[in-house]
């Protein structure tokens, strides 16, 4: 069994039919379908060309729900209302009770993730056993002033670490360049989005994995894949050490992640954990 633990509806030209065909082509049995709620001035305008945004953000929960309703056995439903909204917890609770939401994600906002409002939501997720998928990005100059000169999310790895430690009863799933750059102890994380070169000891993400049992990570997108591909020898040791807390995921529609994982020579029981067992452990998929 294979579970893609990070993807989105109507993403990069994929309507439901294309999405399901793509899953079938690569042997993917289920997908975690994540929303992205955000004020319009907190995401780059180019996302309007790769998703169907509305007043709630680039990837509305309504689109996730539409996919789930039409193919209930193929998707695990995620929803991440903006924690800064006064009704965030109420909306999430309603989505859980009415629609069977099982994930809180994707959280991708210009706020520090140790914000007290965010911590309240994270603790609620822990009580309801919803894993929390977060996107972290550092400031990189876009060359323009408007709508924003850069697109940072989360406040860096330190703010994320404080949140993870402040909410030990909540499972967090790290994702995106600002998380995966910290697989290495070098100083590239705030200089380039996708660092290259051998992984050096002392990476903050590795330290967090060893110290925070409630931290998981998905291998999605160029950031997760790139973190492994930059040093295949280290990638194998990393996957072996943290085999119980890594999730196969794509955030795209190609097969590069499977191809690379399968090339590492990992034991079949380790691949089984990464491909599906860890995801199933966090949220047992339900047909609704």
Feature-to-residue mapping (PLM):
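Active-site gating/metal-coordination segments in enzymes
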Residues: 44-152
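Active-site gating loops and adjacent loop-to-helix segments of metal-dependent hydrolytic enzymes
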Residues: 26-55, 72-74, 139-144, 176, ...
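A cross-domain feature marking catalytic cores of carbohydrate-active enzymes
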Residues: 7-9, 13, 35-36, 79-83, ...
